[in-house]
Structures are given as C-alpha cells and as structure tokens.
C-alpha cells in the first residue's frame, strides 16, 4: 500500500491507497519540529483503527512546502516503514515540463496539482489552490506548468485583519448569513469583506488571465477552503478536493513504471 504525505504550511495530510482506491485520509496540524517518533505515535493509532500495521505500507511519496520538515518525514518512512520515499523536488520524476524562468522555485504542491488536474480536465487550465496562500497556476494543454499568481490566503487575511486592528475580533470565515454585500455590524462587515473580497479576487484574476492568454480556459479549484466559494461564483468550473492526492498517486505510478523499465 502507498502512504502519500502532502504537507502544506497549515495542515499535513496522510492518505493510504490500496492499489485500487484511497481507503483512509487523516490530517494533522503542520509543525516543522515534529519528529519521526512523534509522527509514528499518532499515525500508528490511526492505522490500527483501519486494521492496518506498519508492514502494510510498502511505498511512500512526500510533497512538502516546509523544507525543514522533510528530514523528519523521510525518517518516518525509512525507520518505521522500511521504505525509501519519493520526495517531490528531490528524487521524484514528475514528468512535467516546467516552463518558467526559475524552475527550481516552483512549489512542490503547485506541480503536483498540475499533474492531478491535467489527468482529468481539458487544458489549458487555471488551477486555484486555496490554502495558507491562494495560488492561481497555469497548466498548458500538454500538461506543462507555465507559472501563476500567488496571493495571501483567506485565513491569513482574516488573521492579519484581527491582529493589526485592535478593535476587530477574531471571527470564523463564512459567507455572510444574510447574503448581503454590505454588513450591518462589525462581524458581518468583516465576513463580507473577506468572503466577497476573495470572490472578487478570484473573478478578477481569472478574467485577467483569460484576457492575457486570449483563449478559453477551464478553471479548477482545490484546497482547504475552496468549498466555501461553491455556489458563490460562476468563474470556477470545477471544485476538486482530491486534486493533490490524485497528482501524488500519478507521480508515484510514473516513477514506479520507470523503475521497472
């Protein structure tokens, strides 16, 4: 079975694929100092709940945007599963043509998303990933990664609003309950500013990208808060929560195929 680890700045996802389907997915808060021993204490309990032991894992792939965590995740795979992991950006061959000025700067998560999106949707594509940062990435019709846009994430914006303005409370991010744009109290005004502000960001950047490239493009959204925008904009064609793990599975398949040639 394959253990796929996808680590963002906020959360780390662990997923198990049995060769046919994903049978388990778990999330933990990303902590860059968490050791392999700490990971395995947590993970062993979850594996046990699925009726699985360490020996069931015979492959591992890691994608992380937190460089200081990769050492411990690699040790987790080596020490406890006796598996040399594929690591995006190190020893994993992605099969993606990276057409940007500095290919080494392309984030692992963005390249994995490009692979996952190209497998399912007709290109060219705009892939929006709503996480700690909100990224808009361009995937050509042939699957190449052609750059994109990086903006602050919605949670980061809300946090900055609270921390920088003494009288503004910390609130949950949600669509304003009354459905209106203009808030009538502080909380609804903040919710409207962040929620509809991000809708405007999405709609504006998607329109500008399409105009600059002068071609029809399919827009796919993924990430932790992407579902929040469902039904609020016509600029997104597909919401796909499995985009990243689909990309990881395909990259693992490509590398396994290369090893057997």
Swiss-Prot record:
GO terms for molecular function: ATP binding; metal ion binding; pantothenate kinase activity. The keyword Membrane does not apply. Keywords: ATP-binding, Coenzyme A biosynthesis, Cytoplasm, Kinase, Metal-binding, Nucleotide-binding, Potassium, Transferase. Its cofactor is NH4(+); K(+). K(+) binds at residue 129. It catalyses: (R)-pantothenate + ATP = (R)-4'-phosphopantothenate + ADP + H(+). Substrate binds at residues 107-110, 186. NCBIfam families: baf, PRK13318.1-2, PRK13318.1-6, PRK13321.1. This is Type III pantothenate kinase.
């Amino acid at each position: 079975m394959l253990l796929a680890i996808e680590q963002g700045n906020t959360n780390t996802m662990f997923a198990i694929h049995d060769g046919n389907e994903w049978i388990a997915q778990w999330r933990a808060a990303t902590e860059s100092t968490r050791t392999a021993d700490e990971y395995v204490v947590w993970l062993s309990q979850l594996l046990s709940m699925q009726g699985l032991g360490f020996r069931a894992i015979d492959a591992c792939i890691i994608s992380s945007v937190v460089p200081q965590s990769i050492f411990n995740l690699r040790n987790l795979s080596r020490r406890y599963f006796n598996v040399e992991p594929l690591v995006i950006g190190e020893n994993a061959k992605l099969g993606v043509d990276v057409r940007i000025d500095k290919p080494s700067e392309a984030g692992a998560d963005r390249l994995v998303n490009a692979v996952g999106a190209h497998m399912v949707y007709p290109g060219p594509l705009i892939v929006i990933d709503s996480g700690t940062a909100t990224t808009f990435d361009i995937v050509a019709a042939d699957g190449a990664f052609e750059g994109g846009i990086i903006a602050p994430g919605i949670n980061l914006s809300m946090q900055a609003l609270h921390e920088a303005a003494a009288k503004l409370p910390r609130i949950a991010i949600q669509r304003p309950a009354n459905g209106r744009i203009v808030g009538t109290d502080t909380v609804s005004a903040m919710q409207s500013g962040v929620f509809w502000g991000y809708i405007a960001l999405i709609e504006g950047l998607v329109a500008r990208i399409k105009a600059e490239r002068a071609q029809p493009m399919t827009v796919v959204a993924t990430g932790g808060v992407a579902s929040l925008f469902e039904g609020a904009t016509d600029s997104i064609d597909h919401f796909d929560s499995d985009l990243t793990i689909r990309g990881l599975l395909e990259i693992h398949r490509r590398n396994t195929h290369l090893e057997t040639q």
